[in-house]
A protein has these predicted regions:
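The conserved Walker
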Residues: 40
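Extreme N-terminal, non-catalytic leader segments
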Residues: 1-33
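Small-molecule kinase domains that catalyze NTP-dependent phosphoryl transfer to phosphate-bearing small molecules
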Residues: 138-197, 201-211
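Cysteine-centered motifs
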Residues: 225-229, 243, 258
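Conserved lysine of the Walker
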Residues: 44
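ATP-dependent NMP and nucleoside kinases share a basic, alpha-helical "lid"
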Residues: 73-80, 96-156, 163
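Hydrophobic anchor at the beta1->P-loop junction of P-loop NTPases
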Residues: 36
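Conserved substrate/cofactor phosphate-moiety recognition/catalytic segment
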Residues: 49-97, 101
């Protein structure tokens, strides 16, 4: 059997009636995956949780997948051997791809210590031209160990926990992450804002969300901004939908125009 081929036979892929681009035009949301990687105690879950909250408050579809949480269900059959870690990341990469294809900004908070596994996850997105952004949540080992929120470093040092990343199992630092967050030097808010800026830079935020992120925080003002953006979205979708010759580039143009609108609104 070819490497990466399904074990099951007699299966046929069923295509959607909408392309990823058409779905994003109709919903006003472009999916993306932000892959937070780093040592235990680096701050991945903390950054991911607040980032998810900020995105949802901005009107964007977002969902966070956490390394511990998925082991209570989807990956409860996996341990922490090198092979199980590899399968853990493979499964999560596939789940993130599905979420991203549906228009959800997916935040994956996983130690994911091996570069080959992270690269394999990125490749899943590349073949479908979906947005994958690797964020290295960086902190010195001694700082992560001093934090030790789950008491795992203490167990590893005592020998009660074997194969723990950073102690007796390796962590391979990303060489080309789209963003590095030094949580020893940056505040939580600064880290989250850097992630939002990264998403905007790569077009991974819907134009309604970009407008709200930069709009005034007063409830009535936010509601008016949201209403205006939806009207603008519907108008552009109608116009661009009629221009079938330029349809393939319509989405990025829409995001760009409305991103500029959002920034200018904050200065008024």
């Amino acid at each position: 059997m070819a490497a990466g081929a399904p074990k099951a036979q007699n299966i046929v892929w069923s295509d959607s009636l909408l392309s990823t681009h058409e779905r994003s035009l109709l919903t006003g949301c472009r999916g993306a995956t932000i892959w937070l990687t780093g040592l235990s105690g680096s701050g991945k879950s903390t950054v991911g949780a607040l980032l998810e909250k900020r995105l949802i408050e901005s009107g964007l579809l977002a969902y966070r997948l956490d390394g511990d949480n998925v082991r209570f269900g989807l990956n409860k059959d996996l341990g922490f051997s090198e092979g199980d870690r590899k399968e853990n990341i493979r499964r999560i990469g596939e789940v993130c791809r599905l979420f991203t294809d549906s228009g959800v900004v997916t935040i994956a908070s996983f130690i994911s210590p091996y570069k080959s596994d992270r690269d394999a996850a990125r490749e899943i997105f590349a073949k479908d031209k979906l947005l994958f952004l690797e964020v290295y949540v960086k902190v010195p080992l001694e700082v992560a160990e001093a934090r030790d929120p789950k008491g795992l470093y203490k167990k590893a040092r005592s020998g009660a926990l074997k194969g723990f990343t950073g102690i007796d199992a390796p962590y391979e630092e990303p060489a080309a992450a789209e963003l590095t967050l030094n949580t020893q030097e940056m505040t939580l808010e600064e880290c989250v804002q850097k992630c939002l800026d990264l998403l905007e830079k790569h077009g991974g935020m819907s134009f309604v969300a970009i407008y709200l992120v930069f709009a005034p925080l007063h409830a009535n003002a936010r509601a008016r901004c949201c209403s205006l953006c939806r009207i603008f979205r519907d108008l552009l979708t109608s116009v661009l939908g009629a221009c079938k010759g330029v349809r393939s580039g319509a989405g990025s143009y829409t995001y760009m125009v409305c991103g500029v609108m959002g920034r200018s609104s904050a200065t008024r």
